[in-house]
Regions:
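Surface-exposed beta-strand/loop patches in extracellular or lumenal glycoproteins
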Residues: 378-403, 422-438
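Metal-dependent polysaccharide deacetylase catalytic core of the NodB/CE4 family, i.e.
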Residues: 85-165, 287-289, 329
Length: 471
């Protein structure tokens, strides 16, 4: 118990007991909407024994989680989502694979960051460099014209805002710096260790004080009618004492592991912790965390234990009357919380994109580093770093599915029904795949021939190639 630092959080937890009972009573005659999200401190190099093991873990997640989602979709009519908070010190070589996760709809990518001994200046400099690398794969960018830096955050070693007695951070104004760089909020807590805040089971705002550490130790609750309050947004997961745990009472800290998986008694406790925006108690947020890259915990995240957890969630908390279950990403949870602040009610899934639009790679996936100029449902523009490198781009813009070629610039405009490649290499070849039922009215700058599966084979003759669709 002492190693879980109950001295820091238990007084607040006990003081919330009456509120928890009161809010459950208020929800008895209405539908409780359960917003369920898993935030993964995703570290594929952790305790890797072989050189190729991190890449294998990343690929196993793509396959295994896709299989779990298919099973859940078939069994329950909807599928879970995952939020991978990826740390740069585990390698930029995995960013394309993570962008695939996002493009394929498995979930979304956010930032996990370990550091130590930083100053405000060094943290700004280092984070900007990290963000530039992620942006070159379309990650941590909000879709739009132009795309904007935008990310959720989990601090390494739980030490947000220098909260670990000077270790694993060093910066007292970290909340301010994160906001400056495009961070919409933090999802680090709970930790149930020395970094744990006195504030528990809350969605709230902390005002940064650069003169002292741990400014997020307390703050103002998010509440209906108080839109866009001052401070930095934080969303916590459930923390408390689970008296129904098998064998003996346990500390519930919202962590998913193979040993401590999503058992029915834990699921009930997550809801009982009652994390919500004040004034909207019927929208209950269940934010869990895990260190999911390591093989030992895969069963609890996309194996049989995971499926049993989702079976319990759907059987007990998705009857459509007393409860409705909504699987959300971290970004979507933030948007729904902001919608509650603005007074919205009813179906929270209507507000998944309320404040922050989907991530940029919702609409495209490029196989090479690039600078993204625009990413919307109807248009994608980018410049590749190395025009001599053959680049494959998958698309969700109407009319176009995929292209592969050597080029410097790409502009896919579904409104104008055109795909433009600039800086092409004459004499090279390329390929463009069109949507079913769509045909090319003209191709300028390249000879072309039709192939199977709605594809055009290109023999490039000019530096500029334009494919125009027929009406």
């Amino acid at each position: 118990m002492l190693e879980r630092r109950i001295d820091l959080w238990l007084p607040t937890y006990l003081s919330q007991a009456l509120d928890r009972r009161r809010e459950r009573w208020r929800r008895r005659d209405t539908t409780t909407h359960v917003l369920f999200l898993v935030c993964d401190h995703f570290e594929p190099r952790h305790r890797a024994k072989e050189e190729g093991q991190p890449a294998q873990r990343v690929q196993r997640w793509r396959e295994g989680y896709g299989e779990l989602r298919s099973r859940c979709q078939h069994a329950f009519g909807h599928a879970p989502l995952h939020s991978w908070f990826y740390p740069p010190h585990h390698g930029y070589e995995h960013l394309f694979a993570l962008a695939q996760y996002q493009f394929e709809g498995l979930g979304e990518i956010e930032l996990h960051y370990h550091h130590d001994g930083d100053t405000s200046e060094s943290l700004r400099k280092n984070l900007r460099a990290v963000l530039d690398e992620y942006h070159s794969w379309g990650l941590l960018l909000e879709s739009g014209a132009p795309p904007k830096p935008c990310f959720g955050f989990i601090h390494g070693d739980w030490a947000l805002d220098n909260s670990c007695n000077g270790k694993y951070c060093g910066v007292n104004d970290e909340l301010t710096i994160l906001q400056e760089l495009g961070c919409w909020g933090d999802l680090t807590m709970p930790s149930a260790n020395e970094c744990q805040t006195r504030k528990v089971n809350s969605i709230y705002y902390a005002v940064d004080d650069p003169a002292r550490p741990k400014s997020h130790d307390w703050g103002e609750d998010a509440r209906v009618g108080q839109a866009d309050p001052k401070g930095f947004f934080l969303m916590q997961g459930p923390l408390g004492i689970n008296w129904r745990a098998p064998g003996y009472p346990r500390i519930e800290n919202a962590s998913i592991t193979d040993e401590n998986w999503g058992r029915p008694d834990r699921i009930q406790k997550w809801l009982d912790c009652n994390v919500h925006v004040r004034g909207r108690p019927e929208w209950v947020f269940v934010k869990l965390h895990t260190h999911g890259a390591v093989e030992r915990d895969h069963d609890s995240l996309f194996g049989e234990k995971a499926f049993e957890m989702h079976r319990t969630l759907n059987q007990r908390f998705n009857d459509g009357k007393r409860f409705r279950l909504h699987y959300v990403t971290a970004r979507e949870a933030y948007n729904i919380a902001k919608a509650a602040e603005h007074g919205h009610a009813g179906d929270p899934s209507a507000y998944r994109d309320f404040r922050i639009a989907p991530n940029a790679t919702r609409y495209y996936l490029a196989s090479a580093p690039h600078r993204l100029l625009q990413s919307t449902p109807m248009r994608v523009q980018l410049e590749v770093r190395d025009p001599a490198q053959r680049t494959r781009v998958r698309l969700r813009t109407p009319g176009f599915v995929e292209l592969e070629a050597e080029f410097a610039t790409l502009d896919v405009d579904s409104h104008g029904r055109t795909l433009r490649l600039g800086g092409c290499v004459p004499g090279s070849t390329g390929r463009v795949v069109l949507s079913p039922g769509v045909h090319a009215a003209s191709v300028n700058g390249a000879q072309h021939s039709s192939q199977e599966n709605h594809a055009l084979a290109l023999s490039v003759e000019s530096h500029d190639v334009v494919v125009t669709l027929g009406s």
